[in-house]
Amino acid sequence: MQPDLHCRTLAAHTLKHFRALSPLTHCMTNDVVQTFTANTLLALGASPAMVIDPVEARPFAAIANALLVNVGTLTASRADAMRAAVESAYDAKTPWTLDPVAVGALEFRRRFCLDLLPLRPAAIRGNASEILALSGMALGGRGVDTTEAALAALPAAQALARQIDCIVVVTGEVDYVTNGQRTLSIPGGDPLMTRIVGTGCALSAVVAASCALPGAALDNVASACCWMKLAGQAAAERSEGPGSFIPAFLDALYHLDVEAANATN
């Protein structure tokens, strides 16, 4: 199955809908990236909410437009809150996205993520090692870092997408987005995106928010990946290093004009 290059014209159209809807996105994410994730969503036009207590997480997941579950700093109590939120989202038909951070490196989070899969995530976003581990095809990875190229994990992503009936995103130098039948490739970005903490986690939040949009989920999620790649490229051109990249990246998301990027690339 050959990946198709994602159409930036479609990404531009999807971004207009995204900004008009401003999806209320319930982010149960890790402690390291809370602020960056919220600012990324705000810069693009979404409405983030970082609700984590189990008493609040269950009812809030039912009223949000989308839910993100990121297991980066998983604890037993946080797992209980996440499970409650996912069960509520499932009952309310709120689309939820799983970011299985370091799932191949630690057994507790691997079992937790596998236990959530029957509750039908709308999307799963991970690096190659994480997707391989979640699919059962490999275990390993250096914590949150990948030891595999994204393309190497594509067969696992396609099989997982068919098994769960969801969208699976494998991120890397080129991102691959698949529903198991059709696969889209999104090149771009910049190496500076790997020199700061949180770009992958923030992408998962944007993917989650995009799942709230009407239309084809595959195209919406691929558009989310395209937005982040374009913003990363634009920010890198204005940055001297990781310290100046972060504010430049948020500015690039805020001013993102995919149609203008099409005209100059």
From Swiss-Prot:
Q: Which InterPro entries does the UniProt record give?
A: Hyethyz_kinase, Ribokinase-like
The protein's superkingdom reads Bacteria
- Record-level Gene Ontology MF annotations: ATP binding; hydroxyethylthiazole kinase activity; magnesium ion binding
Q: Which reaction does it catalyse?
A: 5-(2-hydroxyethyl)-4-methylthiazole + ATP = 4-methyl-5-(2-phosphooxyethyl)-thiazole + ADP + H(+)
The cofactor named in the record is: Mg(2+)
**Keyword RNA-binding tagged:** no
**Top-level enzyme category:** transferase
Which pathway features in its UniProt record?
Answer: Cofactor biosynthesis; thiamine diphosphate biosynthesis; 4-methyl-5-(2-phosphoethyl)-thiazole from 5-(2-hydroxyethyl)-4-methylthiazole: step 1/1
Q: What does this protein do?
A: Catalyzes the phosphorylation of the hydroxyl group of 4-methyl-5-beta-hydroxyethylthiazole (THZ).
Q: According to its UniProt record, which protein family does this protein belong to? A: Belongs to the Thz kinase family.
Instruction: Report the protein name in the record.
Output: Hydroxyethylthiazole kinase
Q: Taxonomic lineage of this organism? A: Bacteria, Pseudomonadati, Pseudomonadota, Gammaproteobacteria, Enterobacterales
